Amino acid sequence: RCSSDSFLLVATCLRALTAMGHVTDKVELIVLGGTWSDYPESYQRWFTGELFRALNLSDEERVREATERRTWYERRGLPRDRDALAAAAAPLQQRIDAGELTYNEAWREAYSEEEVPQSCSWDDLFALHRANETAPKRVVGLVVETRPDLVTAEACRTLRALGCTKVQIGIQSLNDETLAANGRAITSARIADAMALLRQFGFKSHVHFMVNLLGADPVSDIADYRRLVTDPAFLPDEVKLYPCCLVESAQLTDCYEAGCWRPYTEEELVEVLVQDVLATPPWTRISRMIRDISATDILAGNKKTNLRQVVEAAVDATDEEVAEIRSREISVEGATVGDIAAGLAISV
């Protein structure tokens, strides 16, 4: 719908948030999906610059430019309507399905005739940064996602110049045997190097961690997570803690059918996640506990959308103290105005 245009993405989100009554004077930009550091540096500059430019414009200017951009894309064969786009691409899709073209060949045939004006110099980007310091909608955080093996000193310098404040990386496990069994092509030592670089360059770290991978078991998963949050080589600021779910297209399907991998029972999964929550230190936030995968697409594994609620109820039943950031937030416990006032008086 937005043609992967960062200006349009921001404009669309701002319109939706404003319509729902949200205040948008402070914005955290989160660029998810893909491997950010794999994109050419010129594209990274342009994409980031358009994020800032969309926030720097007035509401009227933003709406006007968004309309002009959508018209520009539609004239070049990228309509907003999904059915219209599918119809326009149908002949090429048929050739892809028949094995006559690869996806990349089809893309070049469809769109390479028009040069997309995606340009932003470092000076242009720095000017957008400075303008945003006094803009009505200010960026308070910029997050991108990449792989641990692409976290290098050079990549970190580029991220700092772009204005990034936090980096998401998919770790999944620190057990080298588990990593190898799941084709991760990386080691815990390289992950430790990536975490060290992120800290040295002043980034917050947000890692993705997965339980019930091929080769793991509940005991090893609990130990693996405990290492993540206690070993000084790691200690992330945030964690997305996911249970492994089987979808039809995954290679794990063969292992499932052969009986060499099975999903944890609900009792096993909840116990692993309970122990993970209890092990989480006070400087770490567990931001998510499931993936947004439709239950109809999951062949085996957790399908409960309220898994975190189930886990938190089990944590409460232990009567053990929870240090994890989200569990200690005022909103969770429903503090009264009097409680807040008393806290302010004590802090003063």
Predicted features and spans:
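Secondary-structure boundary/capping micro-motif
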Residues: 2-17, 22, 26-27, 42, ...
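Conserved non-cysteine loop/helix-boundary elements of the Radical SAM core domain that shape
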Residues: 2-9, 33-53, 67-206, 210-267, ...
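Catalytic cores of glycan-processing enzymes that make or break glycosidic bonds
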Residues: 7, 59, 63, 119-128, ...
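Structural signal for hydrophobic packing residues in well-ordered secondary-structure cores
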Residues: 14, 18, 51-55, 59, ...
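Intrinsically disordered or highly flexible coil/loop and linker segments, enriched in small
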Residues: 19, 23, 60-61, 234, ...
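Divalent metal-dependent hydrolysis catalytic cores, especially in the metallo-beta-lactamase
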Residues: 28-32
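Acidic, His- and aromatic-enriched active-site or binding-groove loops in soluble protein domains
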Residues: 52-61, 227-237, 265-266, 307-322
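C-terminal accessory regions of radical SAM enzymes
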Residues: 260-348
